[in-house]
């Protein structure tokens, strides 16, 4: 039974800023707040008067063809189809087999790499009071304020997509003292980088490897609105700002990576032009404009995206005036009401992270988004296809950020497809292209093969793995339905898909203890262990985030499938296997699709309790992974979990016509703790959006739709038609 929350006891909070009364330390991913424009990522930290910006560039990687001659992206030198046939024969005979002979070479795989730190040192700052730093999620601007005996200081930092630079603006109520700016690269050998300066800028150029072959070149400039004196021996620019109360610094960066040069025609080099001219141009261009113009254009761009969707939840704990680190520290998963203000704040932060790390001209966000302070990021800061990469996109389309997903499709076209065509030919003797679980930015595709298959990160190498069968089912349906929209002219391909679909094993088998089976193998092989709390829910990918089980099999309305999913989730535990945030938000979304409000909300609360750091970023808490390592997919997956509590919106399969009615359910798992909340701008499949609100029990009672097809039936969880 839902508990009653009196809305009159609290007001709806805007929940639009993260703030702290303490400066962030060098432990940036646990304490600092993030900014970005897709290409550049920034984490401001450091004490007043010695503020630093930790900088990243989305393309800066070590490894790959820049550092390894003859780099092959994990592919073999010659065809492996005979070995593949032998492995398959072994599996058909024994049920399982050894596919190690097919594994790709990981030499030169590399890692996402920190760009630099920029220090802005202000002379004479001591006896600081009234310190506050905040990130406004409505504007994407990070503001630090503090007072000294000389006056009040304010610094604003933001990363502009229109200008392709980040801006640091310093203001003081008194005239400024000397300000010194300089770069350093503390995670790399000093022989690999060089800090220089001129009268109006500080600069750092570096390379990831001296060679041969010479590694990737990177370049970053911080250009000042007030000229100064360059110390060429240190690369420090000393700015005498005593006649001014403000200073603007524009930061730009680039590399010689070129995503369009990863084809056979370019020998998969990914080698582009030296970034020097580009970096000089964008920083000069930005500084030629007024800071107010740069700010206005940034806010228009950022806020236009952020304001496309609004989630309002009640501030039942009076949390609005409490800093983020305290809210996180005091949060308890076992407190059933949670803290709706914080839960909404983290939802908004997830959208901010996506806006800041996924743009039309950038790579998609990797496992660290675009923020890593180290030389070797955890898990290389790469892309994991089994769940993590797709989790990054769970909240994009429904919350009005669909245009930003172009980054991942560009990455697939430029990075996966060219080398993946070689993988398909060498490993499978087939046409088309293929990629496997772990990818870098250099077209690495060759690790584990699809068939033979495995269930991600556990179990045997076998055939007919549930994870893959459910995905293939969904891919086939998508191809059939998308062909007309895309203007597909390959009639042979479509005929093959349509002929194969009825014969396809679709990954729905219920086991002896009532679970969705993870492998097609008979139970006598004893791989289906009840109580296996592995982090992945691979056999439920067709329940969420997919819909082969939940929609194509009508599982959302089928008691037998619902029971099997429920049994599987209970067996899998609450997500403490490695105590990662992403395993919990996935469970939350699955429970929400079962209309199980209690468990969906608990998993959300457990994520905050166990995995959200003082910065609002998701950190590992233990297990067999690096303790405290930052991994961004839980921040993005959090969006998907909350959206699953707010809506069930799934496509029909290809047997249905355009005239068939599709049902959308609003509020399948809204907790009573969110009483009186509302949503504006939730985008639905097929176009259009819906606004809705709910009562003190979490039951949606009001809704209005804009641009939604008449064939879409919108109901609440009790089946009441709303629109």
Swiss-Prot record:
GO terms for biological process: polysaccharide catabolic process. Residues 1-15 form the signal peptide. GO terms for cellular component: extracellular region. InterPro entries: 6-hairpin_glycosidase_sf, 6hp_glycosidase-like_sf, AFCA-like_C, Alpha-L-fucosidase, GH95_cat, GH95_N_dom. The keyword Hydrolase applies. Its EC number is 3.2.1.51. It is found in: Secreted. Coiled coil: none annotated. The keyword Mitochondrion does not apply. Pfam families: Glyco_hyd_65N_2 (PF14498), Glyco_hydro_95_C (PF21307), Glyco_hydro_95_cat (PF22124). Glycans are attached at residues 77, 98, 117, 171, 194, 243, 334, 558, 566, 595. This is Probable alpha-fucosidase A.
